[in-house]
Amino acid sequence: MRKFNIRKVLDGLTAGSSSASQQQQQQQHPPGNREPEIQETLQSEHFQLCKTVRHGFPYQPSALAFDPVQKILAVGTQTGALRLFGRPGVECYCQHDSGAAVIQLQFLINEGALVSALADDTLHLWNLRQKRPAVLHSLKFCRERVTFCHLPFQSKWLYVGTERGNIHIVNVESFTLSGYVIMWNKAIELSSKAHPGPVVHISDNPMDEGKLLIGFESGTVVLWDLKSKKADYRYTYDEAIHSVAWHHEGKQFICSHSDGTLTIWNVRSPAKPVQTITPHGKQLKDGKKPEPCKPILKVELKTTRSGEPFIILSGGLSYDTVGRRPCLTVMHGKSTAVLEMDYSIVDFLTLCETPYPNDFQEPYAVVVLLEKDLVLIDLAQNGYPIFENPYPLSIHESPVTCCEYFADCPVDLIPALYSVGARQKRQGYSKKEWPINGGNWGLGAQSYPEIIITGHADGSVKFWDASAITLQVLYKLKTSKVFEKSRNKDDRQNTDIVDEDPYAIQIISWCPESRMLCIAGVSAHVIIYRFSKQEVLTEVIPMLEVRLLYEINDVDTPEGEQPPPLSTPVGSSNPQPIPPQSHPSTSSSSSDGLRDNVPCLKVKNSPLKQSPGYQTELVIQLVWVGGEPPQQITSLALNSSYGLVVFGNCNGIAMVDYLQKAVLLNLSTIELYGSNDPYRREPRSPRKSRQPSGAGLCDITEGTVVPEDRCKSPTSGSSSPHNSDDEQKVNNFIEKVKTQSRKFSKMVANDLAKMSRKLSLPTDLKPDLDVKDNSFSRSRSSSVTSIDKESRETISALHFCETLTRKADSSPSPCLWVGTTVGTAFVITLNLPPGPEQRLLQPVIVSPSGTILRLKGAILRMAFLDATGCLMSPAYEPWKEHNVAEEKDEKEKLKKRRPVSVSPSSSQEISENQYAVICSEKQAKVMSLPTQSCAYKQNITETSFVLRGDIVALSNSVCLACFCANGHIMTFSLPSLRPLLDVYYLPLTNMRIARTFCFANNGQALYLVSPTEIQRLTYSQETCENLQEMLGELFTPVETPEAPNRGFFKGLFGGGAQSLDREELFGESSSGKASRSLAQHIPGPGGIEGVKGAASGVVGELARARLALDERGQKLSDLEERTAAMMSSADSFSKHAHEMMLKYKDKKWYQF
């Protein structure tokens, strides 16, 4: 029977509707204007959404475990997440459905299983023998709270301590409770009426499995005999207990207490401890007890054959060490090493050579789980150096403020970045290899290079190799190195927009082919970087200062006497070119003492040594104007072929030629409209005209005379007489407004900076991103007033390309497309010098084209298709080393520039069209060029808004991918905008997701799922099918090490380890059944059926088909064997029956 496919039905419906709409459009247009039919290859079956991998440090860690045979590390978190680490490149992420905090983890050593205890009193058994671990069993305690668990090595019985002081025993194979229970009132002294507190420790004697050591929080320790069901010894101490550890010989144990002391006890001497140690306490001269210290939260005792044992502990510092960082103390013989940590210690484990507790442990390393880091300390080398961590756990080293994802990069890019990044690695690491090396890598078919770039709050930019679902840091760039550090708070307040993180990265623009990098920072600064493998010494850092503010000047100000610069109407049929002009850049203050012409950050004026990697090409800063700080940059684009960078904010747009170090364009948003402004807006402030900006700043000029009325304001001098008192009142009012405006501007900037920092905090959407008042609700109302539109119109999208700009154009030309938050798209044409020799000698002419397109909602992304529907990538300059000794002359360098145009338009016929794909918060449009008619239109969402939209390549075609605020991920075919995928994935819960979600080619996407973790996902069916093969394996068959030899005399005199038949002791036959109301067993999806259900897509179907086929084949084989046996038996029976018949056929009845 043929399988019914609902997707093909939907494709037929959508294709039918799209064809109907196309027919309607064709009826509306004459035959000569019909759009050529483009064959689209993408269908619904090419898309499927699934998570792939999660990278980064586990957010809010709470538990730690290690399998010493499999060499696998497990970390649990407060959000119920489970992260497993093997060799570098082998990682796994799991999530408990309840989301409760993980309080403890226990490996079934070398069994491929893990037990997790959660704060909701549930135990889970995880199966690690599959690439995606799943829960086999769960056990929910109903009447008691779980506080501690202990699973002896090579045992299937799990001891579970509770808050009431009782201990229950669970069979880990069936996850059922045993009837054997250790009650707290039987464990303590019968004469004692006080409750000993929750169970904080359980462990069996290394030499006698029948003796169980139980530690209660109040300070009581009990050695329980499992066979006789009574307490052998009871040890009491005045201070509360936090942890207990055995000596491997089973004759002594050590306890850590809340007063910072360690007590060592002999098993057979319960009266008092053999020794009391206060590691960090001051020893008093008169022999009195040392002063109490902070609690020792955990202690471990590990022995060696060749020397003194190691005592390792966390906490216990003296109370007078105020401000001291958390420490891990390693005591070995007479030496004590205090190792300071950067963050609070959550847990630690000592890695030993043997898994057997009754043998010399021979510790070789300590794993320290910190609040925001994972540290591995080498115990075998002097000074206890740390191992170099190969996992990508430093994503959050500084809070992530933005990120970009690039798939299918040039193949030589990752080796180039790795080579320059390898020089940045610090020294002093342990010389040994990383000891956590379990598991095996996956065998994925995905081979194209992938790079992730993250921008951080401290101004750093990190490049990551993300190929084949792994992550490895390649290179780190510190953008703050070009700026002077503010020495005192007063200087910082004079210029900074924000009080903290003035170097935070907001936008990243990167050209992988040319390796040019451009970043925009929170202090309204832009830095352009060029990649070089040579070290250079920059004598003077090139810089430009730009005044990006549109205001009209008063006549009575000194600056007002100069003729103001004029703007060209955008809608003019003959737009005038914009010649470059040069103006001196001087920092000054206005006549009323307001800060003016001063950037927020100060560039270093001393020579700067730039290491191989990304080196500063140009620094651009927006300056203060009339006491008001510059607005933060909202959009950024760079083109290496043109040598241009453009950026915009809520005031306007500026274009810079970074080859000539000149400003080509400086327009306000209103000036982009010219006479075509549909809102008839006037400049927002009638006080100041725009002053000449930094070196190389250009203003638009036109040949007509400017009316004088345009230069005047209501408060300027005019023919009407004004009373001096009225003027004074007006001036006072203006000063108050300016003061309040400055305060408000800085307050808003601080709020934006704090919002960027909140990417590192688990904030909820409701207090910080209100549904009705947030930065993403710019265009959700169709009835926005002109004042509201004016206050909200910001440059939101920029794109360089060679397109058919005007309706009369017959050949494409370089241009810049500009999108704003009110849904308007402008086109600015670029007239480049004819050859590379003239590039530095002649200016780039910039002029508005007059083309204006409108959409509903803020424009997010723009791209272009050729007549065949292929994506037209912007032109670029191939990378070439610039810092070569024989090429010091700038003109010689420029002659060797070979810009490459990857646009297919050069090979097109003149009559062929292009398509402009424009995506806004609400809708997407495909405009036919040069006619500028709407070929296709799709309303993406009515009730929500698009957060991120990207035009991406997939399966030799292109599509539009969108992520909406309501959690839907959608894809549309191009150019017809036919819906292909619409899946509810993730609701917008905080600004972190909104700021970091991005799509990449080949069906890849990512976002910052927590302040420390990146979640990658795919919307490609092919990747989903191959994902199972790409994932690494956690469990590998390894032989368990041999048990330690007991020795002749120990075996003869009974000095060796005593075994215990736990099955006989805890089984149902001897201990009975546990109460059903005590705990509830919940079967998990991770068994044989769970393994079948865990697989997804075609791989899962094939796996199930193979499994069913194997089972059917096995059954058929068994049936065949049974049938053959029955046939053989039948033949034998027939033969014997025939012989009997021949024997007795001639005999009479009386002869028998």
UniProtKB/Swiss-Prot annotation:
Q: Which GO terms of the cellular component aspect does the record hold?
A: acetylcholine-gated channel complex; cytosol; extrinsic component of neuronal dense core vesicle membrane; hippocampal mossy fiber to CA3 synapse; presynapse; secretory granule
Q: Report biased composition (Low complexity) as residue ranges.
A: 17-28, 713-722
The way this protein sits in the membrane is described as: Peripheral membrane protein
Expression across tissues:
Detected in heart, spleen, lung, skeletal muscle, liver and kidney (at protein level). Detected in brain, particularly in the olfactory bulb and in hippocampus. Detected in the tenia tecta and in the piriform layer of the brain cortex.
Record SUPFAM superfamilies: SNARE fusion complex (SSF58038), WD40 repeat-like (SSF50978)
The v-SNARE coiled-coil homology domain extends over 1087-1147
Q: Which UniProt keywords apply?
A: Cell membrane, Coiled coil, Cytoplasm, Exocytosis, Membrane, Phosphoprotein, Protein transport, Repeat, Transport, WD repeat
Skewed-composition ranges (Basic and acidic residues): 883-893
Where are the annotated segments for Disordered?
14-35, 555-596, 675-731, 883-907
- InterPro entries membership: Lethal2_giant, Lgl_C_dom, LLGL2, V_SNARE_CC, WD40/YVTN_repeat-like_dom_sf, WD40_repeat_dom_sf, WD40_rpt
One Pfam family in the UniProt entry: Lgl_C
Residues recorded with modification Phosphoserine: S693, S724, S760, S783, S786, S901, S903, S1059, S1132
- Ranges for the WD repeats: 62-95, 102-141, 146-182, 201-235, 241-273, 295-337, 345-379, 401-478, 506-620, 634-696, 795-852, 861-935, 940-984, 998-1021
Q: Where in the cell is it found?
A: Cytoplasm; Cell membrane; Membrane
* GO biological process entries: axonogenesis; exocytosis; positive regulation of exocytosis; protein transport; regulation of exocytosis; regulation of synaptic vesicle exocytosis; regulation of synaptic vesicle priming
Modification sites for Phosphothreonine = T763, T785, T1040
Under the GO molecular function aspect, what terms does this record hold? syntaxin binding; syntaxin-1 binding
Gene3D superfamilies in the cross-refs = 1.20.5.110, YVTN repeat-like/Quinoprotein amine dehydrogenase
Where are the annotated coiled coils located?
none
The family assignment reads: Belongs to the WD repeat L(2)GL family.
Subunit and partners: Part of a complex that contains STX1, STXBP5, SNAP25 and SYT1. Interacts with STX1A and STX4A via its v-SNARE homology domain. Part of a complex that contains STXBP5, STX4A and SNAP23.
The free-text function statement in the UniProt record for this protein reads: Plays a regulatory role in calcium-dependent exocytosis and neurotransmitter release. Inhibits membrane fusion between transport vesicles and the plasma membrane. May modulate the assembly of trans-SNARE complexes between transport vesicles and the plasma membrane. Competes with STXBP1 for STX1 binding. Inhibits translocation of GLUT4 from intracellular vesicles to the plasma membrane.
> What is this protein's record name?
Syntaxin-binding protein 5
Q: Which gene holds the coding sequence for this protein?
A: Stxbp5
